[in-house]
Structures are given as structure tokens and as C-alpha cells.
Amino acid sequence: MKGDPKVIDYLNKALRHELTAINQYWLHYRLLDNWGIKDLAKKWRAESIE
């Protein structure tokens, strides 16, 4: 499929931002879980999956 390179670039940037956000939520979930803050960790995990 061929597309406008500028549009594809914008979509790739948006995807990169979303994946970065997911990784940050997951990292914070793991840290909170490790520190014993289980209730907040569950919320961050759910947010990372959303």
C-alpha cells in the first residue's frame, strides 16, 4: 500500500509516542509492585494495557 510519506511519518511518530507511554506505565507498574504498593500498581498495569 502506498501512502503520502508525510502522513506515514506523522502516524509513525504517533505510534512511537503511544508505545513509549505503554512502556512507561509498565515500568512504573513494575516499580510500584516491587515496592509493595500493590493497589496503585494494579491501576498502572491496567492503564498500560488500555
From Swiss-Prot:
Ranges where the Ferritin-like diiron domain occurs: 1-50
Cofactor: binding comment: Binds 1 heme b (iron(II)-protoporphyrin IX) group per dimer.
Pfam families: Ferritin
PROSITE patterns linked to this entry: BACTERIOFERRITIN, FERRITIN_LIKE
Broad class of enzyme this protein falls into: oxidoreductase
Cofactor annotation: heme b
A GO term for molecular function: ferric iron binding
GO BP terms, alphabetized: intracellular iron ion homeostasis; iron ion transport
EC number: 1.16.3.1
Annotated InterPro entries: Bacterioferritin, Ferritin-like, Ferritin-like_diiron, Ferritin-like_SF, Ferritin_DPS_dom
Keyword entries, A-Z: Heme, Iron, Iron storage, Metal-binding, Oxidoreductase
Residues annotated for Fe cation binding in this entry: 18
Keyword Manganese: no
Reactions catalysed: 4 Fe(2+) + O2 + 4 H(+) = 4 Fe(3+) + 2 H2O; Fe(2+)(in) = Fe(2+)(out)
Summary of subunit composition and partner proteins: Homooligomer of 24 subunits, arranged as 12 dimers, that are packed together to form an approximately spherical molecule with a central cavity, in which large amounts of iron can be deposited.
Function: Iron-storage protein, whose ferroxidase center binds Fe(2+), oxidizes it using dioxygen to Fe(3+), and participates in the subsequent Fe(3+) oxide mineral core formation within the central cavity of the BFR protein shell. May act as one of the electron carriers in the reverse electron-transport system from cytochrome c-552 to NADP(+).
Family that this chain belongs to: Belongs to the bacterioferritin family.
Official protein name in the record: Bacterioferritin
Organism from which the protein derives: Nitrobacter winogradskyi (Nitrobacter agilis)
Lineage: Bacteria, Pseudomonadati, Pseudomonadota, Alphaproteobacteria, Hyphomicrobiales
